[in-house]
A protein has these predicted regions:
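Alpha-helical substrate-recognition element adjacent to the catalytic core
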Residues: 1-77
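C-terminal cap/substrate-recognition subdomain and adjoining C-terminal extension
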Residues: 52-134
């Protein structure tokens, strides 16, 4: 199973601070044994250095090394371009574009998207760590 992670609104709050339980969530995902990929506008050209630099300033020192093990993705107009829809996956994102949601629905894959809503559930990442055990 591939794991895809957005950054803004998932690991970072809307004010740019680190989300509650982000370190533990990242550790659970990276240590799950599943491939983990950045799927964020901060990393859409196959280069994850910008996202790693931003998060490295905010996470615990023990988490910094985990950040570099997450694979970058490449995509242009839609994050779905970077997802292998034929393979099992889980996608953590706060707000996919409407056409991305519609495409997932048409493919019968909408349940693979996990909506992260840190505004209404600031501790949501604590509960979502269990996806690393799938």
């Amino acid at each position: 199973m591939n794991i895809y992670l957005d950054v803004d609104g998932v690991l970072l709050n809307h004010d740019g601070t680190l989300a509650n339980h982000a370190d533990e969530f990242l550790a659970a995902m990276v240590n799950s044994g599943h491939p983990v990929h950045w799927l964020t506008t901060r990393c859409r050209d196959g280069d994850s250095s910008a996202v790693v630099a931003v998060l490295s300033r905010l996470v615990q020192p023990s988490t910094v090394e985990l950040l570099t093990s997450i694979k970058p993705t490449s995509w242009a107009a839609s994050k779905l371009e970077a997802i292998d829809l034929r393979s099992p996956f889980i996608w953590f994102d706060d707000q996919p574009l409407q056409f991305e949601i519609e495409e997932l629905q048409e493919c019968g894959l909408l349940d693979r998207w996990v909506k992260v809503d840190l505004l209404s559930e600031p501790d949501q990442l604590s509960a979502l760590r269990m996806f690393g055990e799938l």
